[in-house]
Amino acid sequence: MTREEFATLVGSRPVILDGATGTNLQKAGMPVGVCPEQWILENPGVLIELQERYVEAGTDILFAPTFTASRIKLEEYGLENSLVQMNYELVALSKRAAGGRAYVAGDLTMTGRQLYPLGDLMFEDLVEVYKEQAKVICEAGADLFVVETMMSLQECRAAVIAIREVCDLPIMVSLTYNEDGRTLYGTDPATAVIVLQSLGADAVGLNCSTGPEAMIDPVQQMAEYATIPLLAKPNAGMPELCDGVTVYRTTPEEFASVGAKLVEAGVAIIGGCCGTTPEHICALKQAVGSMPVHMPLTKKRRMLASERMHVEIRLDGKFMVIGERINPTGKKKLQAELKEGSLSMVRTMATEQEENGAQILDINMGMNGIDEKQMMLDAIYEVTSTVDLPLCIDSSHVDIIEAALRIYPGRALVNSISLEKEKIEYLLPIAKKYGAMFILLPLSDEGLPKDSAEKHGIIREILRRAEAIGMGKEDIVVDGLVATIGANPKAALECFETFSFCKNEMELPTVCGLSNISFGLPERSYVNTAFLTMAIGNGLTMAIANPSQELLMNAAFASDMLLNKEESDIRYIGRMNYLSEKHEGMEHVWVPVGTAKGAAVKGTAAGQAGNAGGAKDSGNANEARSAVFTAVLKGNKNHILDEVKHALDAGETPDDIINGHLIPAINEVGELFDKQKYFLPQLISSANTMKVAIEYLEPMLARSDKEPKATLVVATVEGDIHDIGKNLVVLMLKNYGYHVIDLGKDVPADLIVDTAMKENARVIGLSALMTTTMMRMKDVVELVKERGCTAKVVIGGAAITESFAEEIGADGYSKDAAECVKLVDRLLEKE
């Protein structure tokens, strides 16, 4: 199937996907804990019968059962050397079941490993894992691909890049969302569709997670930005335990009724996930088969995105600032740090610029004496772990920009592409491949344009070249090419003409490097501010500038208000209130309209975020305390030891630091996580930062006879090989002073209970991601009672609920790692 054929199919009517595979195979006798792919190959008739029933029910696309047949997943069962044969045979089984009446999609999913910097799996290694599997699936004859049940946008990117480097088959991508409407890593539905459609996905949507009703709102969010079809594959409700069996209550008729609402909301491709059967798909086909298809947007919006937020660049929208400070040019202290391999100042600059109102951050690592490419990658990892803002990748080297775009977990802005041969022939296709926007720099191999007519010609030619490879005006921002007024008295007037031409004739947004205009002049801030105000009036959309310059920023806010831009009066008043409080010494962080939810944090520690960048010269203990607190709050793992040592030098004891600063900081992180202002990356980053501090202080605590609070045994239950959530629980509990015995994943009930009794553990913590392994938790609870083990049992996992915990007799349930600590504290306080 070609991508064009896929688009034609989806544009003609709602396309029906199949329903659940795993839950139906389990009903047919597949045991818990086996490798599903191997069991299918040993029992091929079961899969063929199920998928034939789906085809009879009206399915247009079957998912081949290659879901966990990647090298990383197969290694869990010692089957990695069977990868090629297994994927070939699994695709063949589905093609046999389809019988030419349905298409077959090769199915990829998450690996269960954490990507760097949260884990040890490098992005390029993950791309290779997906490429290996995708190549086999493509050669086996799959018609298209689906990347499904994804929790991480970055893993989605790796899979799409891998498939695109192997073949040009259609790609559908589907993520899972929590009740709060975000993925586990904090990505909202709109951001996901913006990033993935720009990267080359042919359809984007969501699956699993919830029942169909809860998917309507996320679908509507996606539909506002989607230029490709949307898909939905909901569960048949949430799983419940009935007489020891996991059941899904949503009937085929109920499922089909809400399925019709999903199609009305914008879904063009629809099927079922956990708990659905051929009967659900048959009812769905009857309900939606003749409904009109919601057509995606024909005109793209100018969108940039990080992993957790998106911003829109509008011709008549609010003026935007690209923070310029992360650039070593002229910054001797930053240059010295970069030569030492430190990115502490980069973190601080990112945080300060976000808090001062920048909407995008420019990253430039151009200097002698360092590996610029590696430093660019390290800076991107550091900044994306610190702030939510989208990035502008700034380098004069094509290979550095390509490396940065490849690993950036969002949709970036490239700074810049000119008509120079290297840029237009090599960098432009790279920007297209990775779905980036770019700054159009009106230069050619002949140098600066001689006049406006030549500049206009270069702009038109670069636009033509971009359109020839599938890009458009929505992917471009034009640089006004600001010259120094000291050398060219008409420099400002020429820029104003360019801004006006781009906005009014070309319908293109514009940007400029603001400070160039005043180079060599005294009191440059006045010149810069006057130029900015006049430039905005002539159509300038954004500027690369220092957002900490209050005069400049205030002029931008005032200019927007005078031009009567939407909500400009509210933004101006908010800005003035923020400055008033700031100048009165109040600790306050301003979050301007349109920035990321939770991008900045109000409070004592957050108000001093800039202090986390380096150790203090002062011996003041209060200052040291705030720095320790803030380092944990901001996840500054590379500098926490400097702050802890400074606190010790200032007179703090190890106990003071842990109980007075580290634990309060991680408590605040947990509260921010509960409020959905922090997400999994920030939680892990802060927890790892605290771990560094605890490990440093532990020997000192041992000398003072400090004992652990209690012993706990934690494990992922038998048959379940997922451990991301469990690992985070272990990390958090250790940070709070508990002695944790981590038994790992796929752990039998006997070993869990035996270990708890041998170690005199007071709590057993159980994790399960899959609905098929939930019942193993009940086995542990029953064995605890049978053997007279006194440990409390607490449980958690994606499909686990409070009612399930009560039904199996567990002592408690927590939805996440932060809540688990509170639960354990409460249980032990009662004893």
Residue ranges and their predicted role:
Residues M1-D479, A483-E831:
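Domain-level signal for soluble alpha/beta catalytic cores
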